[in-house]
Regions:
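Metal-dependent amide/peptide-bond hydrolase catalytic core
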Residues: 56, 62-220
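Acidic/histidine-rich catalytic neighborhood of metal-dependent amide-processing enzymes
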Residues: 1-64, 100, 104, 172-187
């Protein structure tokens, strides 16, 4: 439009799979050469010169061994802080009163409902991107913390026990022995992305962002 004639080819390449593995770009470059130079405009952020490493891990058990907890569901995206979680419990009146008392004294937002399947506790938090979990409030982690203060490992099962012991409501990986940082990209973060426990299924997914100067083997 401006009448400028260049000697090189300028090409705008659009993709739609940034959040799902970028397979669209992989397919595109099977048929077209990589550009000699490229840049990616990304909203109104500043220029990015480094990106943390990403580890997205699933922890599961072969058998759901919880005796009191029948269901626990939270999270839909691995790269987000879950803003809602719920658990179903076969609880006594005494345990319910204790749970309510602890819920009132905590910084969480909990709702108690009585159903034919038992006590349902709903936890509400604040969503955030997994790379900045401290900017949100993890509803799943808060709910695990609440029930773990009342029930034993046998009653809540191995997955909830692991979350409570190894992470709880932390976002810096301290209890996992992973607290670290560098001057280039900052601190390692850990996000409890989802929990799914029902029937014989028991699993949790975590999103870890580690400093750019750190080897993935050090994290694993």
């Amino acid at each position: 439009d401006s009448g400028v004639k260049g000697v090189n080819t300028l090409r705008a390449i659009y993709g739609t799979g940034e959040e799902t593995g970028m397979e669209d770009m992989e397919n595109y470059f099977k048929k077209n050469p990589l550009p000699d130079m490229a840049f990616t405009p990304d909203s109104d952020y500043g220029i990015c010169f480094a990106e943390k490493g990403i580890l997205q891990l699933e922890v599961s058990t072969l058998l759901n061994n919880a005796t009191t907890l029948s269901q626990f569901h939270a999270g839909r995206a691995v790269n987000a802080v879950p803003d809602r979680a719920y658990v179903m419990l076969d609880s006594s009146d005494y345990d319910e009163q204790t749970l309510m008392r602890l819920a009132d004294a905590s910084d969480g937002d909990f709702e108690f409902n009585y159903t034919i399947d038992g006590l349902m506790i709903i936890s509400r938090g604040k969503a955030a991107h997994a790379c900045e979990p401290d900017k949100g409030y993890n509803a799943a982690a808060a709910l695990v913390d609440l029930i773990s203060n009342v029930y034993t490992t046998k009653e809540t099962g191995s997955i909830c026990s692991f979350i409570d012991y190894a992470i709880n409501k932390e976002t810096n990986g301290r209890s996992l022995g992973l607290k670290m940082s560098d001057a280039v990209s900052g601190s390692l973060t850990v996000n409890l992305s989802s929990v799914n426990i029902e029937g014989q299924t028991a699993k949790a997914v975590f999103d870890i962002r580690y400093p750019v100067t750190v080897s993935v083997n050090r994290v694993l």
